[in-house]
Amino acid sequence: MPLKQRVSSEKTGAFALLDSIVRHGVKHIFGYPGGAILPIYDELYAWEEASLIKHILVRHEQGAAHAADSYSRSTGEVGVCFATSGPGATNLVSGIATAHIDSVPILAITGQVGRAFIGTDAFQEVDIFGITLPIVKHSYVVRDPRDMSRIVAEAFFICKHGRPGPVLIDVPKDVGLEKFNYFSVEPGKVNIPGCRPITSLKSRQILMAAKMIQQSSQPLLYIGGGAIISDSHQIIKELVDFYKIPVTTTLMGKGIFNEDSDYCLGMLGMHGTAYANFAVSECDLLIALGARFDDRVTGKLDEFACNAQVIHVDIDPAEVGKNRIPQVAIVGDVAEVVSEILNLLKTSFPPYPEQIISWQERINRWRQQYPLLVPRKSTSISPQVILVATNKLAQNAYFTTDVGQHQMWSAQFLKVKAKHWLSSAGLGTMGYGLPAAIGAQVAHPNDVVICISGDSSFQMNMQELGTIAQYQLPVKIIIINNRWQGMVRQWQQAFYGERYSHSRMTEGAPDFQKLAEAFGIKAFTINNRQNMQSALQVAIDYPGPVLLDCQVTENENCYPMVAPGKSNAQMIGIAKPQRGTASNYINNSV
């Protein structure tokens, strides 16, 4: 419960802030102190002493934003981060933008120079309100401490309602210090008419969608992150069980449906499975749930699902029809919409199983002809082999990733549950993985959290090893170390005449094992298959943090790949069907 009961008494703006966020259920804050935010940190001291909230000290404010982001993705709650004014606030920007494009509800609270100094170019003054306007749902500058509790209540409401996203509250230093007669605004007691999602479903659209599903002989569910946010995994499972509709997901939708199921085709798009991309190209009905038809999914847009009618369901009316005009557009919560459609299907539109069986058999032939590929056994290790082995040892783990080849391989080969896949999808933020692992581990202290990173991405935020060491967070860090900016090199090889401009990462590269050990973190270097399995097992079983520097084959490319401007059916690097699999590879199921 809050430090003080709801009484009229003289309190500071800093007290009002902390009291308000605790009333909203916040248990953890990620942040870094500084001059303008010191009044809030000074007040925080008493709240931590009373065990009412815990602050996690990061080593860079970007890490605070990513940790809050991951905390939110894995729990469904609002993640909170603190930073001071000026460079502290601007260091949050990449993290806020990451949360914005992936629809993650985080609350960023920044210090600001005193009210009298705003606009004077004072020391560490930056217009963070203006800077962040394009990447937040809403921004506030608290000009009167009496508004603090209301602003916090509104911020939490805005973060979570409709399409989730970040909100920023900028707090001038003297607002945190000023005393006033404090009354709290209870959580949820807000009135923001312009921030109300559409909740009444239109029966006509539901009826049209149900009819289209029954009449389809080759339907496909295309599921994005909105379905994860909606907690719709159970109702989607019921729909698939009833109508036997195959499922493909975006990077953000990964985990929404059992990835071991025969009906799961994995990820679609640029590095999706061949059979998912063929299914999209051949389906006659595409049911898009919480997905936004972005370019990495669609490839050449006018050839994406070009034989299909489209049902598009999304909580955000701005997304429906933005890139692809649907035959049926439904604005609403994915779980609620699917529930309505399923109820109507069960009562009025029974399935025709012979149609769906034929479609599933066709997909299964693609699955057999064009499997995901893993290099044949050799003394060296490949990224795919490491990921398959890791997944077998830690089937219920939370996985965070950075961005690049290792992210795409992880999406292909790791099989995860909903909210156990934590990755920067829309913005593609290198450096996300390590601080995201901190956020996930803080949120789930008794679960295994594994950060899959690349040697280039890891160096973006490797200072957060200090945070992991300070709090002894038992994060397992697996670095896929190929001595390149791997995805950049792959594109330079494929599209830029093998001119490898500034993508080699050997000179100046750290010894990751020694680096981790300098922070007091157990670490191993893996450079062959003989010690890979045992090192992975030790890392998973060890009660503290562990780093594994996995020195993999250098020139491995991530396939399949859809080249820019090509349709999803035009993939590079898939097995040729007449040979079953490529000569240097084996099916990952072997």
UniProtKB/Swiss-Prot annotation:
Its EC number is 2.2.1.6. Residues 405-484 are annotated as: Thiamine pyrophosphate binding. SUPFAM superfamilies: DHS-like NAD/FAD-binding domain, Thiamin diphosphate-binding fold (THDP-binding). GO terms for molecular function: acetolactate synthase activity; flavin adenine dinucleotide binding; magnesium ion binding; thiamine pyrophosphate binding. PROSITE patterns: TPP_ENZYMES. InterPro entries: Acetolactate_synth_lsu, AHAS_TPP, DHS-like_NAD/FAD-binding_dom, THDP-binding, Thiamin_PyroP_enz_cen_dom, Thiamin_PyroP_enz_TPP-bd_dom, TPP-bd_CS, TPP_enz. Binds 1 Mg(2+) ion per subunit. Binds 1 thiamine pyrophosphate per subunit. Keywords: Amino-acid biosynthesis, Branched-chain amino acid biosynthesis, Chloroplast, FAD, Flavoprotein, Magnesium, Metal-binding, Plastid, Thiamine pyrophosphate, Transferase. It is an enzyme of class 2 (transferase). It comes from the Eukaryota. One of its GO terms (cellular component) is chloroplast. Its main location: plastid. Mg(2+) binds at residues 455, 482. The keyword Transmembrane does not apply. Pathway: Amino-acid biosynthesis; L-isoleucine biosynthesis; L-isoleucine from 2-oxobutanoate: step 1/4; Amino-acid biosynthesis; L-valine biosynthesis; L-valine from pyruvate: step 1/4. Disulfide bonds: none annotated. The keyword Chloroplast applies. Gene3D superfamilies: 3.40.50.970, TPP-binding domain. Its cofactor is Mg(2+); thiamine diphosphate. Thiamine diphosphate binds at residue 61. FAD binds at residues 163, 271-292, 314-333. Belongs to the TPP enzyme family. This is Acetolactate synthase large subunit. It comes from Pyropia yezoensis. The gene is ilvB.
